[in-house]
């Protein structure tokens, strides 16, 4: 999806239609659309030909995008969880793993990257009633596997704003919440993590429309992607005006939230009350 979005931006920037792009590599406009949506594999030669058509001559830029094409054709670790991973979320997991900066605002639950196993199990069991124990175990395992990027050599930076409501919404009982609060405190002390709490005391704010995540790919010099999850699907926004608006909203949320130390103090206070 990362490569497809970049190919679409390059095509649109030079005013070439999908029909014309498809003609140049002997495929239909529908096939070009599928490529740009990240819903098909990429032939390296096709990507090279499209880059030439789009006027991309810089060797470093071409190499980066061709490397992305090769990577996109490799089965990611998350394919092992295809039985519990819908296609619309598999795209997010792929992007999350490639991001160098993940910024998020959460209003209902702790973000999946920050959840303990017990908290994840409680959230999944509550939100997806009727699942078998095996399916719940698989979904928890997937969530824990995603978190391995936080331990990797190239761990992304995390900028997190949690609405205080997240911390008061009990999931799994007292012991589970104690473990989750302690985990957030420990995460907040990492050098690559900036965690802030939007307190109840602050009224209307820029995040009233709901949770969202902004993924940045500084290593690849690619545009940011905004992820907005829905009940049975998700929005992936990468157009400049959309990304800019969400970026401004997150900046306002950060300015209006408690600072990192005050947020840690609030987490400690809530932990002591459990």
Specify the residue positions occupied by each region the protein language model found.
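Short glycine/serine/threonine/alanine-rich loop segments
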Residues: 16, 27, 193
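Short acidic (Asp/Glu) and glycine-rich catalytic loops that position anionic groups and cofactors
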Residues: 26, 44-48, 225-229
């Amino acid at each position: 999806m990362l490569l497809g979005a970049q190919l679409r931006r390059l095509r649109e920037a030079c005013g070439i239609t999908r029909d014309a792009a498809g003609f140049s590599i002997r495929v239909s406009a529908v096939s070009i659309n599928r490529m740009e949506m990240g819903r098909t594999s990429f032939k390296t030669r096709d990507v090279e030909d499209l880059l030439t058509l789009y006027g991309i001559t810089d060797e470093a830029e071409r190499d980066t995008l061709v490397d992305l094409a090769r990577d996109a054709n490799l089965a990611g670790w998350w394919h092992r969880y295809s039985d519990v991973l819908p296609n619309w979320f598999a795209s997010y997991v792929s992007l999350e793993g490639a991001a160098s900066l993940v910024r998020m605002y959460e209003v209902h639950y702790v973000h999946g990257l920050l959840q303990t196993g017990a908290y994840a199990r409680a959230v999944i069991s509550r939100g997806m009633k009727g699942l078998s124990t095996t399916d719940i175990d698989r979904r928890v395992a997937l969530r824990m596997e995603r978190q391995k990027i936080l331990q990797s050599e190239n761990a992304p930076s995390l900028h997190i704003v949690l609405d205080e409501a997240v911390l008061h919404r009990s999931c799994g009982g007292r012991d589970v919440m104690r473990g989750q609060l302690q985990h957030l405190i420990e995460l907040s002390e990492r050098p690559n993590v900036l965690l802030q709490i939007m307190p109840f005391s602050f009224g209307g704010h820029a995040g009233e429309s709901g949770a969202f995540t902004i993924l940045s790919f500084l290593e690849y010099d690619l545009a940011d992607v905004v992820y907005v999850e829905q009940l049975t699907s998700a929005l992936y926004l990468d157009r400049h005006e959309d990304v800019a608006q969400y970026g401004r909203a997150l900046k306002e949320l950060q300015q209006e939230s408690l600072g990192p130390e005050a947020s840690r103090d609030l987490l400690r206070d809530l932990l002591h009350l459990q």
